[in-house]
């Protein structure tokens, strides 16, 4: 049996960072990753980076094959860089499957070779996998893809169906629409973007439909099957025909390969690994970080989980999940939609003293310079404490602007401060002067 100070299962953001840090400090560290294609984790290889690379490449006058090749070049480069960075710190990297034999012993297997590893500290960083709904034919029909498979098609589908109207589905809808596919999004919910401000969601729906994307709500899928190479999506009322189908019906924590039944590690009702404020499971010394612990599925949350565990293992444990404040998010549709904090309806439900303001991008000089007048800014503020309660930024570059607002919220900077903040001109960010003049 091989003994380590730290074993990390999974090459994701939190795990790889922790492994490198502790190895650099002289600890004996092992990192186990079952797929060489996943060095660096989901974001680098099959998530944020390749999908945003595809979006940028789609804006250029490239063929479908060139767009895919561009994505593969960038992800391959970053994959190799991540491996080299971690290996360079002295971490023992095992390309193998890993599962638990007991609370502190894991077995790894590569082909026919098996090894047992043990450590007082084990970090589970296995991420999440696509949630396959129990729809007849979904898992067995050909030309049906998850969010990984849809990034690696050999040819552009003339007609693409997307099952699910969440962030992943809508981002791929915009991408493949730009590439030239006729895209139809079929969503089981009766409301488009239910977590967004209704006025912003209405604009997003309008723009996507103007761009040629068909958006269908309240769809009840009963079966998926093939007619030759075509995919037939059967609903209660109609049958839709596609050349390819993407199912984007959420992602769930990747716990099944771990064989946690051999341990005392507890799961939540939703199947995630249960953790405390230090990301530690109920088994002392065993931690779960990133998507597998049931938190928000963003790579920057995984990075913050690293900070929490590192504080516990190396520092005084003072930084915990309880210190995590406002978490911004961006959906990379066209234009990008970014949000942080509360919506107006949430503020009303909490019976807070609030005020709102919304201004269209069409009223912003930079929008005219960019030649793109689509979108709007909306803010929700507390009229008594002067705190910013939330904001929705729907415009080109919103993914950058939202971070300015998040910093202000985390540091309780009064919204009135923005009315006198000096911004460069012409920018979209300068319109925060007007947005917060409430």
Where are the regions a protein language model picked out?
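Beta1-alpha1 glycine-rich phosphate/pyrophosphate-binding loop at the start
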Residues: 4-6, 11-77, 175-195, 325, ...
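Flexible, glycine-rich terminal cap/loop adjacent to redox cofactors
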Residues: 9-37, 42, 49, 53, ...
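Beta1/beta-strand and adjacent pyrophosphate-binding region of the FAD-binding site
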Residues: 1-12, 156-166
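FAD-site-proximal beta/loop scaffold in flavoenzymes
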Residues: 140-157, 239-316
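Glycine-rich dinucleotide-binding loop and its adjacent helix/turn
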Residues: 48, 126-182, 186, 214-215, ...
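Rossmann-like dinucleotide-binding cores of NAD(P)H-dependent redox enzymes
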Residues: 40, 73-79, 151-152, 157-161, ...
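A Rossmann-like FAD-binding core segment of flavoenzymes
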Residues: 92-95, 99-110, 117, 180-277
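N-terminal Rossmann-like dinucleotide/flavin-binding domain of flavoprotein oxidoreductases
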Residues: 2, 42-116, 195-222, 344-346, ...
